[in-house]
Structure formats: C-alpha cells, structure tokens
Amino acid sequence: DIMNAASSSPAKRRPLVLVSWNGLDTPWAMIHLDATPEFDWVLFDYSGRAQTQEVKWRDQTAQVLSGATECKGEIYQALGSWLSTSITPQTHLPEYIGLLDDDIVIGVSDLNRVLHLARVEGLDVFSPVLTHDSRYTHRWSLQQPHRLFRDVDWVEVMMPFYKGQVFIAASPFFKDFVSSWGFDKYLFPMIQKAIKFIMFRLLLL
C-alpha cells in the first residue's frame, strides 16, 4: 500500500536528476555543465533510439533510459519501473528525484544549490522558479525578488523534484497514463497527505 511503499527503504543514496533527450542532439544541450554534480544523472531518450545503458558523455556519467513516448506521463512510468527493479538493499532509494524537460536552461551548480536548500529545509516536493522572460503557464511559478522560498499548493511537472519516498509511493498510479495531466495538482498532493509529507515549495534562484 501507499504507506508501505513510502517506508520500505528509509536509507538514501544521492539524488537522481532525469533530463529528457531526443536521442539525436547533444545530451544536456540546455544544461550548463559548470560544476561537478552532487547527484546522479538519468538521460531519458523519448525517441526510443538509444540503448538502455550506462554511458559517459561530455565528461558526465549517466544512466540512459529509452522509450518512444508521446507525453511526460510515460517518462514517469518508465522511471518508476526502472527504479522498482534497480533499487536493492545495497543501493537504496534516491534522496530526491527530479525530472527536467529538455528545454530547461539551468546549470549543474543551480541544481546542486536547490538540492542543498531542499535538504536544509526538509522539503518534500519542490521546483526552481522561472525567469520572467520564460514561457510559463502559471504566474506563481515566476521569480519573486528578495525571497528564497515560497510555499505553493502544488508543483508543476516541468521541472519537479520529489523526495524519493514520495515518488515511489506515487509510482503505481503512473500506470497507463500517457499524459502527466493531474499528476502535479492532484496525485502528488494526495500521496503527500497519505504519507504525511505536506511541504510544497518553490526555490527562488
């Protein structure tokens, strides 16, 4: 059940950050590789061209996952399935799990920083904010001056980060969802209430 899924692996390993990739262009094309990542990379090839394997590209070590997808819901499914088979008593659950769209411009140092801030604050679900010249759907996802954190009701699926227990507890509900519609506003808040993790925040870089 949800409670057991959330508590089955209390030990943690490094955070995991998945970045979407079209399988053809330069991996991490929008990511500024300006620091050593304090997390593990997953590259998800949504064209299905690449082989599932561990690679070292651009001096970055990454696990490649691959599958022809239509929408982000299938990426959630694929990551959840891979984690369910790769987590062992020796490897444990990632501390945090992030999923970034391939058009997000951000640096490795930024990702290190948001993970550090989330750890310090004990956040359960969070996201970096968008600059005001970004394309956006929700105005509340934009930067605000002189603020480091901002509580919100839910975090959009564009570049969310989840505590490992939250993601794993939600993963059975990803099944057969092509779209991720409703994951952000409904599924993850429901999961958090069920396992008593209730903190949503935006990190204002």
List the predicted regions and their residue ranges.
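N-proximal low-complexity "stem/linker" segments adjacent to membrane-targeting elements
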Residues: 1-58
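Active-site-proximal specificity loops/subdomain of glycosyltransferases
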Residues: 42-95
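Short beta-strand-to-loop acidic/aromatic patch adjacent to the donor-nucleotide binding site
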Residues: 92-105
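Conserved catalytic core of nucleotide-sugar-dependent glycosyltransferases
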Residues: 107-193
